[in-house]
């Protein structure tokens, strides 16, 4: 049986993730006390192949440090993966203000920002051991649903998933990136009048960048670096590795390089994904 534990700070998108898993055929249980998790798995192990449970701060044991020990009591036949959702503090505050929901930890004389900080501390034993961490600050509910679906389906083979993500430094570095490469020194199609409105997936931009020897060398060196160290990461039981490529706006150079790296690695591996975070953001 495959078990996915969905956790994260309040307002980060756990309900969206759980709905996606339900749509994918998972038997879903919302907000189960973690102390009951071993009993639940023993009950459903013969009836369901895929199970997902949502765990929030209200259902933790008295000592959150006991969480790894509780998970260790699960049947050995259960393949456990933890998905942890989070967002920047300012975005969580904004979401609570917009929805006018009450944070579950708010008590008398406790401000919202204090409750959010406390929740982060309480959930740290889960977040630090998560197999997949997603920061939802820059994701709409629809984008989050697509990303969760992509990552879950990408794990069918059980091998490590390699994600090549493009982004723009002007919009911030992806929080979930394991490796970050800066492509801002490369020739920029943005300054070519005919290419400015296109992106790194358009043929004219690809032709422009492919003609630059320095771009080809940059891609080759990243490719060689990752090929060298991926076997060591896999032996460390990593589920995902995200390689983020950044340029100024996240539309041309980083997109092209991420696509080329993914193309190269697909010759050797099956679980390759691409994510172009900022490709649809309008230029300012």
UniProtKB/Swiss-Prot annotation:
Domain of life (superkingdom): Bacteria
Keywords: ATP-binding, GTP-binding, Nucleotide-binding
Keyword Nucleotide-binding: yes
Stored InterPro entries: P-loop_NTPase, RapZ-like, RapZ-like_N, RapZ_C
GO molecular function, one term: ATP binding
Amino-acid positions noted as binding ATP in the UniProt annotation, renumbered to this chain: 8-15
Binding residues annotated for GTP, in chain numbering: 56-59
Family indicated by similarity: Belongs to the RapZ-like family.
Physiological role: Displays ATPase and GTPase activities.
Protein name listed in UniProt: Nucleotide-binding protein CPS_4546
């Amino acid at each position: 049986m495959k078990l996915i534990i969905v956790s994260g700070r309040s307002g980060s998108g756990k309900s969206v993730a759980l709905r996606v898993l339900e749509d994918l055929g998972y038997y879903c249980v919302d907000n189960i006390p973690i102390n009951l998790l071993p009993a639940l798995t023993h009950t459903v192990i013969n009836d369901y192949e895929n199970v997902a449970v949502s765990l929030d701060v209200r259902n933790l044991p008295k000592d959150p440090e006991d969480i790894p020990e509780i998970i260790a009591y699960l049947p050995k036949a259960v393949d456990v993966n933890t998905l942890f959702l989070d967002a920047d503090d300012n975005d969580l505050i904004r979401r609570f203000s917009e929805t006018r929901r009450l944070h579950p930890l708010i008590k008398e004389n406790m401000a919202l920002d204090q409750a959010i900080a406390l929740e982060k501390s309480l959930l740290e034993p889960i977040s630090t051991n998560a197999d997949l961490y997603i920061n939802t600050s820059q994701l709409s509910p629809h984008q989050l649903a697509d990303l969760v679906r992509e990552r879950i389906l990408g794990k069918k083979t059980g091998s490590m998933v390699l994600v090549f993500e493009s982004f723009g430094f002007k919009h911030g570095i992806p929080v979930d990136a394991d490796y970050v490469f800066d492509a801002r020194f490369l020739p920029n199609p943005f300054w070519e009048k005919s290419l400015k409105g296109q992106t790194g997936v358009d043929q004219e931009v690809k032709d422009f960048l492919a003609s630059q020897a320095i771009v080809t060398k940059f891609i080759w060196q990243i490719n060689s670096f990752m090929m060298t160290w991926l076997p060591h990461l896999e032996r460390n039981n990593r589920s995902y590795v995200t390689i983020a490529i950044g340029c100024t706006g996240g539309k041309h150079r980083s997109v092209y390089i991420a696509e080329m790296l993914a193309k190269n690695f697909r010759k050797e591996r099956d679980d390759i994904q691409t994510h172009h975070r900022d490709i649809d953001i309008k230029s300012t």
